[in-house]
């Protein structure tokens, strides 16, 4: 796998609803490998690769990332904001962001009342969004001209490899899934299924792109490629880990939005066991992904989510494992190349 592609993907800005830069890069990357490529009204990028059968496989990975949106520009030049997608405000304090303006990205820093003028009661409380602001360092007039209400901002942290095959970056949710799906399209040769590789939009705000994309494809089965929170850290007990970093691709049995098709789950487990693909079973009481929309399309689609273990999810220091990425790729590629019978 070419991890320079993942590095480039994580460096792009693509808050939900503003995925155009990510989509353009993926389209350029995959156009030479596609039999057909199109973009729909919702902004989903649909890459089609003809198979040797008349059966259709839908593979999806969402382009968007969590981020911020300016909802107030003060007369002092400081910006107030809301979160786009689920972000814990505790992770935002003292972080850098890049505001996406029509004249290019603008650096900002998230601040709050400084510690030396807060009370003991203030310091005992968790900082909420209303206590945070973005400081661009620019004159008020320039801020008001460049950064109107509705401007989005992404967390600002570079891709870095560290430790034993680990990667940390912002937006690994879900540029990691996009990377795996893009590498799959580049690797496919004479797949059994007609493969629809769909790079969806607005997953982080309600699986919206997947709803319309799935409706336009008569899929026989589907896989969603996405990240999931790995809680294998000192603050959590083993029963709450959900999934562990470095132990393989997650096959999702159940989450808040989807119960994985039992026959498909069994087939995926068998593929892993027969092909030395490391896997884990994921059962989560919270969270979901595009599978939640896809499996309800039309009269229903056999669907399962492949989940990539990710520490610090929805932050600017998300962590994934190269090993897990390789296992997700191997499983998804095998599914595309060979018929699954039920």
Protein language model regions, located:
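N-terminal hydrophobic/helix-forming segments and targeting peptides
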Residues: 1-342
